[in-house]
């Protein structure tokens, strides 16, 4: 699991920009990042799984069972690799089609977001200004109290705390007022954005493109299933030695335990 977490962390920390820096490629799209994340995660799970199998076989229970899981793990890993290679082109086609068919929706939503952002920006700027003014006023009121603390030290600490409490409460109340005012001004735009999103989704639902894409997706899933059958059969065949070895060993242990009980 540490390997998986490390792989996920590296992917998120580096992202597409690290790949672009080293390989000088064009920056990745969000779809590419999703696919890369899936690949890295699967590889990390495979590597960490082999590590856990190795740890289990070297344990006392693993030595007693003697399942020889590690011998079959590499074969299983190569089978999974072949499965990924066979299904890769079909999956790539699915992502490409989905990205193309929803391009207009992303474009319209970005346009709506930019429009709303332009309308609410003055309110955000006003809120930031008010915030800075309140902080500056608080600091101004704090300066004489700080000097008083330095001069009076410990004996005036309690008195200083009593003076600071109403100042902090006053700042909190004033900022709460500004936040409420900003929320009131932003509510219509939030409702407007929600309505526009619902409208865009309704357009997507009623568009003939979606119905056509639904048919394409069904065909894609059917083709995916046909291509997956041989690879999944190989995967099943690769797992059979593991299951048979496990079953044989367990039956042997049960039989041995039964003989010991009967002998008693």
From Swiss-Prot:
Tissue occurrence: Major protein of plasma HDL, also found in chylomicrons.
Localisation: Secreted
Gene Ontology CC annotation, any one: chylomicron
Per-repeat ranges for Sequence: 67-88, 89-110, 111-121, 122-143, 144-165, 166-187, 188-207, 208-229, 230-240, 241-264
Gene Ontology BP annotations: adrenal gland development; amyloid-beta formation; blood vessel endothelial cell migration; cellular response to lipoprotein particle stimulus; cholesterol biosynthetic process; cholesterol efflux; cholesterol homeostasis; cholesterol import
Pfam families noted in UniProt: Apolipoprotein
GO molecular function: amyloid-beta binding; apolipoprotein A-I receptor binding; chemorepellent activity; cholesterol binding; cholesterol transfer activity; enzyme binding; heat shock protein binding; high-density lipoprotein particle binding
Keyword Repeat: yes
Residue numbers of Methionine sulfoxide PTMs: 109, 193, 240
Database matches in SUPFAM superfamilies: Apolipoprotein A-I
Annotated region (10 X approximate tandem repeats), positions in chain: 67-264
Annotated signal peptide: 1-18
Alphabetic keyword roster: Cholesterol metabolism, Glycoprotein, HDL, Lipid metabolism, Lipid transport, Lipoprotein, Oxidation, Palmitate, Phosphoprotein, Repeat, Secreted, Signal, Steroid metabolism, Sterol metabolism, Transport
Post-translational modification comment from the UniProt entry: Glycosylated. Palmitoylated.
Subunit: Homodimer. Interacts with APOA1BP and CLU. Component of a sperm activating protein complex (SPAP), consisting of APOA1, an immunoglobulin heavy chain, an immunoglobulin light chain and albumin. Interacts with NDRG1. Interacts with SCGB3A2. Interacts with NAXE and YJEFN3.
General function of this protein: Participates in the reverse transport of cholesterol from tissues to the liver for excretion by promoting cholesterol efflux from tissues and by acting as a cofactor for the lecithin cholesterol acyltransferase (LCAT). As part of the SPAP complex, activates spermatozoa motility.
Family: Belongs to the apolipoprotein A1/A4/E family.
Protein name: Apolipoprotein A-I
Species of origin: Mesocricetus auratus
Encoding gene per record: APOAI
């Amino acid at each position: 699991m540490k390997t998986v977490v490390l792989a996920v962390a590296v992917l998120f920390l580096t992202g597409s920009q690290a790949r672009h820096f080293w390989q000088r490629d064009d920056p990745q799209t969000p779809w590419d990042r999703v696919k890369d994340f899936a690949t890295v995660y699967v590889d990390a799970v495979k590597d960490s799984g082999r590590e856990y199998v190795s740890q289990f076989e070297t344990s006392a229970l693993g030595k007693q069972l003697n399942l020889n899981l590690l011998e079959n793990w590499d074969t299983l890993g190569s089978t999974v690799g072949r499965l990924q290679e066979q299904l890769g082109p079909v999956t790539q086609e699915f992502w490409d089609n989905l990205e193309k068919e929803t391009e207009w929706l992303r474009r319209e939503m970005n346009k709506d977001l930019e429009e709303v952002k332009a309308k609410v920006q003055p309110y955000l700027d006003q809120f930031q200004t008010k915030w800075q003014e309140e902080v500056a006023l608080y600091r101004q009121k704090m300066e004489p109290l700080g000097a008083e603390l330095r001069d009076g030290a410990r004996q005036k600490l309690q008195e200083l705390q009593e003076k600071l409490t109403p100042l902090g409460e006053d700042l909190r109340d004033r900022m709460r007022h500004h936040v409420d005012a900003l929320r009131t001004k932003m509510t219509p735009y939030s409702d407007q954005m929600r309505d526009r999103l619902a409208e865009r989704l309704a357009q997507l639902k009623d568009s003939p493109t979606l119905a056509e894409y639904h048919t394409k997706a069904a065909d894609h899933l059917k083709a995916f299933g046909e291509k997956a059958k041989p690879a999944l059969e190989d995967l099943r065949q690769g797992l059979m030695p593991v299951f048979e070895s496990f079953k044989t060993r367990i039956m042997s242990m049960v039989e041995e335990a039964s003989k010991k009980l009967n002998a008693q």
